[in-house]
Amino acid sequence: MIVGVMASGDESLAKKHEGLAKQVGSLIAQLRFDLLTGGGGGLMKVVGQAFLDAKREILDQNRPAGNLISILRAKELPQLKRDGKRTWEANADNGLGEIVIRTHLPYSGDEGRDTLSRNHINALTADLVVILPGGAGTLSKLQLAWEYGKDIMIFVGKGNVGGKTPEDLARQFGGIEIGRNEQDLRSWLKSHKKN
């Protein structure tokens, strides 16, 4: 099962919510789920590193473990060159992904719901979605996951998503769970675990 963690790439939010992101990454690894992120910096990198650190401990015990999947966006829309080849460059890659999917899709942030955003792939690929603190881009991922009918937990501690509190988001997007602590997140993830 793939757990998509949708979070900000903003480094200042990563410093502020580092502990929260580490809890999420570590717990997903301990439960032996696969983790999907946008493969960028900020909280995406923190959650990915925590996942890999916990995964190493699991593998040291000769137990099976999940994989870290990174869905990368393009820096800009690829262009066809005269020689028939296309230009392509990743916008950001935190270097942690074990399975890396490079898209041609450049949009993010306020444009995160556009058809040229990799956020559609993130939302559709994940079986479950955990939302960490973030701005407009994280909010667009939440909205897409909700539109695609994914099970979602907001886990933001004292943070918010796009300036909205968890309660605001739960009212706006019916059926979303709010995780208040690690036990809430653990119980929610375990309730979806298939043996």
Where would I find each of the regions flagged by the language model?
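Nucleotide-sugar donor-binding patch of glycosyltransferase catalytic domains
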Residues: I152-I178
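Residues at the starts of beta-strands that form the adenosine-phosphate
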Residues: I2, D34, N67-L68, D151
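Short acidic-hydrophobic, aromatic-tinged amphipathic segments that line or gate anion-handling sites
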Residues: I99-H104, Q172-W188
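Generic N-terminal amphipathic, Lys/Arg-enriched alpha-helix
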Residues: M1-K16, V24-L31
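Short, hydrophobic alpha-helical segments
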Residues: L189-N195
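Acidic/glycine-enriched connector segments
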Residues: L20-L31, G41-L144, Y148, V156, ...
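Short active-site oxyanion
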Residues: R32-L35, G174-G175
